[in-house]
Amino acid sequence: MYLKEIFVDNFRNLKKQKLEFCEGVNLIYGLNAQGKSNLLEAIRLLSMGRSFRGSKMSELVKFDEEYFYVRGLVRSADFYEKKIEFGYKVNGNKVIKVNGNKLKSTGEILGHFLTVIFSPEDIEIIKEGPSRRRKYLDACISVIDKNYFFDLLQYNKTLSNRNSLLKKIKEEGKGEDLLEIFDEKLAEYGARIIKVRNNYLEKLKNSMSKFLMEISNEKLEIIYLNSAGVKEVHEENLIREKLKNRLTKSLTLDLKYLSTQVGPHREDFKILINGYDSRVYSSQGQKRTAALCLKLSELEILEEETGEKPVLLLDDVMSELDDNRKKYILKKLEGFQSFITHTSKSDVEGDCCFKIYDGIVMRE
């Protein structure tokens, strides 16, 4: 899979322009604050339907403008081409199209254009709390499993309804008879979510272990702290039963905090390096290496599951790596289309080079 061209209009500081890209390494270089990351953000938007920086849609619109529009032409391994369009107005109207067909929701964009983003912020997945890891895990799985994405949406909707009911029970003293219905649904969706998460984390563990051993000769383990508290995570019926029981037992605590304290929305997974929790005990260098292995594993799993080579976006990553790791990652990226941002041309050899200045991208 590769991105043949992109057209941007009123996106961040980027000037209105159409760009054509190489199938190999596309080096985008220039001084800081000229728009390098903004270009990668526009590309990633066509893949995931949201900013990889966590920005609101309104923040992507150029200053003093009313809208932004991004269009990309993507070719898959079978040479089938897709035109993906994303338009947004500051009044909140959003239109996403694939080959001219309007999508009903942003989530429907997932899977049409596969990308993996590498950035210095990847270390946050290792360093920060459970919600950061859950968010990352859910995004990775949702791209390759539409059923998981649906279950996640339904679970979160049911969770919100249950939390509203808890407030009603606390304030009005009625509605407790409805909890059984919500608990059944949460257990049903939750069991499937837990099973799929476990399967993905098994693949992630195997892949990360391989990469970490190659890079630094260290051992890695992943421990999934599933909310059902079961060891046999492959038995969906058992997971559902255990999760339902835990929801029932946590009612007193739920009413105290007016929120559901048990379920996939509270889960976490630990990444252990040489037997120690990397979040707590690993050095900054070990955490950064673990984050690199995590993203390489995401890439490997995505390719295995889809049969497509994702497009790789490396946002100011090279400056964070020593020479050995830099050579290692460049070797792993061979055969993929990649977009690498850097402040100069000296460190990375690109098949195509683009200089960016004040939002204008010029091919050299």
From Swiss-Prot:
One of its GO terms (cellular component) is cytoplasm. The keyword DNA repair applies. One of its GO terms (molecular function) is single-stranded DNA binding. Its main location: cytoplasm. Pfam families: SMC_N. It is found in: Cytoplasm. One of its GO terms (biological process) is double-strand break repair. PROSITE patterns: RECF_1, RECF_2. Keywords: ATP-binding, Cytoplasm, DNA damage, DNA repair, DNA replication, DNA-binding, Nucleotide-binding, SOS response. ATP binds at G30, L31, N32, A33, Q34, G35, K36, S37. Belongs to the RecF family. The RecF protein is involved in DNA metabolism; it is required for DNA replication and normal SOS inducibility. RecF binds preferentially to single-stranded, linear DNA. It also seems to bind ATP. This is DNA replication and repair protein RecF. It comes from Caldanaerobacter subterraneus subsp. tengcongensis (strain DSM 15242 / JCM 11007 / NBRC 100824 / MB4) (Thermoanaerobacter tengcongensis). The lineage of its organism: Bacteria, Bacillati, Bacillota, Clostridia, Thermoanaerobacterales. The gene is recF.
